[in-house]
Design a protein with these regions (language model features):
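N-terminal secretory signal peptides and thylakoid transit peptides that target proteins
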Residues: 1-15
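Active-site acidic/histidine proton-transfer and metal-coordination neighborhood
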Residues: 11-22, 105-109, 122-237, 312
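C-terminal segment of N-terminal export signals and the immediately downstream linker at the start
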Residues: 23-57, 61, 65
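Acidic (Asp/Glu)-rich catalytic clusters
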Residues: 36-39, 63-68, 92-115, 138-148, ...
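Hydrophobic faces of well-ordered beta-strands that scaffold small-molecule active sites
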Residues: 42-47, 74-76, 113-118, 152-154, ...
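Active-site beta-loop-alpha junctions enriched in small/polar residues
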Residues: 49-51, 77-79, 118-121, 157-159, ...
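Gly/Pro-rich active-site loop or hairpin
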Residues: 52-55, 63, 93, 202, ...
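Glycine-rich, proline-tolerant flexible connector loops at the mouths of alpha/beta enzymes
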Residues: 76-101
């Protein structure tokens, strides 16, 4: 991977930042992850939230279609503690598949389960609840380890009004990371846009502290930065959702460059089908990710609409775009 990364460092930058016009999307260089891909093609990951129950209701055939489209790595969604498996997370029905059965189906289709999104249902992050968080993550880590998953990622933001709230949350994150490390799993946090609002120091809150738009302009520190500053790099990594960073008025490339050892995974996301809007500078984003040696990335396609397209079509079209892109 190192030689490919050195090659990428000499590649030309298409445009500065993460926003781009459609004409810029054709440029880029081959990736180091592509060099490590299976013989069938590039490493292309999918966050299964993109399909929800549409995938689970006919898993074998759905996996075949995704593999044919080019996907060969998964980040799961919908961990179900009671059922010891994975479902649709309450979306579109109650279909749950046992973890071992899910892994076998993916193995049969040639898809590796690399990561998983999950969050505890405990709402209050305070020291009195630490044991409850520990119990959740211990049970989840054991199940995930049993099917060879290497990354567990929390994608939900607790309530944070000041820097002290953030520090308590970070203590929970550090404890979760230590629990996961003990079974050979890396624990991480996934952003949306609210991590890029600012919170004041404890005791300096104002009425504007409860207004997300005002907090984006306010003094104080970004929640994402507080998480980076107050978590142990040996226990907690970060997965950057590049689309939600842009929606939070941030340049994802800048966050990657400024924190090269903390961001290990990416979510590649657009308004709907990847590459369709022309607003995301994917060549720059991939280059920034490869330059810091990311471990992987996953397409996420949320529900949208385009005449004649199903959600499954959108997911497959996204893979088609990335399979042909020279910068991946």
């Amino acid at each position: 991977m190192t030689s490919r990364r050195q090659f990428l460092k000499t590649a030309s930058v298409v445009t500065a930042g993460a926003l781009v016009t459609p004409s810029a999307l054709a440029s880029g260089k081959a990736s180091p992850l592509a060099a490590a891909a299976p013989a069938s093609g590039k490493r292309i990951g999918l966050q299964t939230y993109s399909l929800g129950v549409e995938l689970l209701k006919d898993l074998p055939n759905g996996l075949k279609r995704l593999a044919a489209a080019g996907y060969n790595e998964f980040e799961l969604f919908g961990y179900n503690e009671q059922a010891a498996g994975f479902g649709a997370g309450g979306r579109d029905g109650a279909v749950t598949i046992k973890a071992a059965d899910y892994k076998k189906a993916c193995d049969d289709a040639g898809i590796k389960i690399l990561s998983s999104h999950l969050s505890p249902s405990i709402r209050e992050y305070k020291s009195e609840n630490f044991a409850q968080f520990d119990e959740f993550w211990k049970k989840a880590a054991d199940l995930h380890a049993s099917i060879g998953i290497k990354y567990m990622v929390q994608p939900s933001l607790p309530s944070i009004k000041n820097d002290e709230d953030a520090k308590v949350v970070c203590e929970v994150f550090n404890r979760a990371g230590e629990i996961c490390n003990n079974v050979g799993i890396k624990w991480g946090y996934h952003n949306h846009s609210n991590e890029f609002v600012r919170v004041p120091k404890a005791g300096e809150e104002t009425p504007a502290s409860n207004d997300p738009m005002a907090r984006m302009r306010a003094r104080g520190e970004y929640i994402e930065q507080l998480f980076l500053d107050n978590t142990d790099p040996d226990k907690v990594f970060f997965e950057l959702d590049v689309y939600w960073a842009v929606m939070g008025q941030q340049d994802p490339c800048e966050w990657l460059r400024n924190n090269p050892k903390r961001f290990r995974l990416l979510h590649i996301k657009d308004r709907w089908i990847i590459g369709d809007s022309g607003m995301m500078n994917f060549p720059n984003i991939f280059k920034a990710g490869y330059d810091i040696g990311i471990d992987g990335w996953f397409v996420e396609v949320e529900n949208g609409s385009k005449k004649g397209y199903t959600q499954f079509d959108a997911v497959c079209e996204s893979a088609k775009y990335l399979s042909k892109a020279s910068f991946v």
